[in-house]
């Protein structure tokens, strides 16, 4: 559970969302976030190659079932757009208090359990009958995994350095806030997630579970344990995912970001459909964006890389169908100054010189519950003014509280692209104080 809690903290503070990373490539033409995902794979690959070479672990390589992996990956990619996040993202967003993610998580675990050991297991097994027997690229070529791990790590380091150099050359705006409320750089988060993945394998193997990080099977086991009470389902993997929930809750609570947010009926239905699709797709593909995307890819297995390719395709189709960016309102007037805190942005007080907007995030004051009808953030949500509002003196505020990944990132990136040089954008996602230029 300690490894899971650490993962939950890092993912929550780093906003580590594979759905958003893939979506950015297609909608924003941005690969910066995806590099963080490659960093996870690179660190993981080096670490697992080292542990295998030293005889600390003995990975059991999965054989490649093309139809199941391709179809499952595509379904999973579509589903994580509807659910508002990938498997690990849904776990850590649940820890932030997002009720829509709770729905997605529940049906993700139930559908995965049905696919693995329930009434859908026959369907799952049937699609996996076509099995090539192929395992990994290194085994096919008869070479060490180091021949893949080192070049991949070097290429990732080179690309990351290029992005960091570009970022360093741009003017920055800093926020005066305590260290525990500051976000974690995605590249730092990626490196830590990779290290935790390396640590996870020997710890898991010591309990008899010869595997590393994983979300789908542990989620299925957790639901099976809850419904049957059988102790065999309570294992290292189930404690891992519970730890993610605990860690993300602690991180969100300390940073002032935890808040119960309740989606409307339509959004809830989408989250449920997305959760079911995640469980079905991940079970067919043999893993999610963690099991396939972070573990199997680092072993350079056919299953891992083909699954990720079809997950990306599913995200591309889903993003084109359901996601819509919005940004700064062109020609917005600049009124008097003032800064919202997170609490103020929820209750929507009127700023001096700024007209209040109609918000879909409403707070029940007695119970600290927020009703967010745009929880998943799909294009078909009811119309609202999601543009950044002027605060005066070249500052704007964008209210994203109540939206699930990846919608806040879409709005923020679009808004930033429309700012003039020297202007500032404040996101009402966390408790912040007066921003300062640097």
Q: What positions do the PLM features span?
A:
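Membrane-interfacial helix-loop segments of redox and metal-homeostasis proteins
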Residues: 1-355, 360-363, 368-372, 376
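Short glycine-rich, basic-tinged beta-strand/loop micro-motifs
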Residues: 417-429
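Residue-level detector of conserved catalytic or cofactor/ligand-binding positions
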Residues: 430-436
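Conserved short-loop catalytic and cofactor-binding motifs
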Residues: 207, 400, 426
């Amino acid at each position: 559970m300690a490894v899971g809690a650490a993962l939950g903290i890092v993912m929550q503070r780093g906003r580590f969302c594979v759905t958003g990373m893939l979506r950015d490539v297609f909608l924003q033409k941005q690969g910066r976030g995806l590099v963080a995902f490659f960093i996870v794979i690179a660190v993981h690959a080096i670490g697992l190659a080292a542990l295998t070479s030293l005889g600390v672990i003995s990975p059991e390589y999965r054989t490649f079932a093309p139809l199941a992996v391709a179809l499952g990956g595509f379904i999973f990619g579509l589903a994580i757009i509807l659910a508002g996040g990938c498997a690990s993202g849904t776990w850590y967003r649940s820890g932030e208090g997002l009720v829509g993610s709770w729905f997605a998580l529940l049906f993700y675990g139930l559908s995965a359990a049905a696919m693995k050991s329930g009434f859908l297991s026959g369907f799952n097994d049937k699609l996996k009958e076509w099995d090539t027997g192929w395992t990994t690229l290194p085994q096919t070529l008869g070479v060490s995994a180091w021949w893949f791990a080192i070049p991949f790590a070097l290429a990732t380091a080179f690309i990351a350095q290029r992005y960091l150099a570009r970022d360093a050359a741009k003017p920055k705006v800093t926020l005066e806030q305590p260290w525990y409320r500051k976000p974690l750089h995605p590249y730092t988060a990626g490196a830590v997630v990779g290290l935790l993945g390396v640590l996870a394998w020997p710890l898991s193997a010591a309990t008899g579970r010869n595997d590393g990080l994983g979300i789908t099977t542990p989620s299925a086991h957790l639901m099976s344990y809850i419904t049957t009470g059988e102790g065999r389902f309570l294992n290292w993997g189930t404690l891992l995912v519970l730890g993610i929930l605990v860690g993300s809750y602690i991180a969100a609570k300390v940073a002032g970001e935890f808040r119960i947010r309740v989606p409307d009926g339509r959004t809830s239905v989408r989250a449920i459909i997305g959760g079911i699709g995640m469980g079905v797709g991940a079970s067919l593909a043999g893993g999610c964006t963690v099991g396939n995307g972070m573990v199997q890819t680092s072993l350079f297995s056919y299953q891992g890389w083909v699954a990720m390719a079809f997950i990306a395709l599913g995200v591309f189709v889903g993003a084109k169908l359901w996601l819509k960016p919005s940004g700064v309102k062109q020609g917005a007037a600049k009124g008097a100054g003032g800064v919202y805190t997170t609490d103020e942005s929820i209750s929507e007080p009127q700023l001096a010189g700024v007209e209040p907007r109609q918000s879909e995030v409403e707070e029940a004051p007695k119970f600290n519950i927020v009703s967010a009808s745009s929880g998943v953030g799909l294009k078909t949500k009811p119309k609202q003014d999601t543009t950044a509002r002027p605060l005066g003196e070249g500052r704007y505020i964008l209210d994203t509280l109540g939206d699930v990944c990846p919608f806040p990132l879409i709005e923020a990136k679009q808004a930033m692209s429309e700012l003039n040089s020297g202007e500032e954008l404040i996101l009402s996602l966390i408790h912040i104080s007066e921003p300062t230029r640097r």
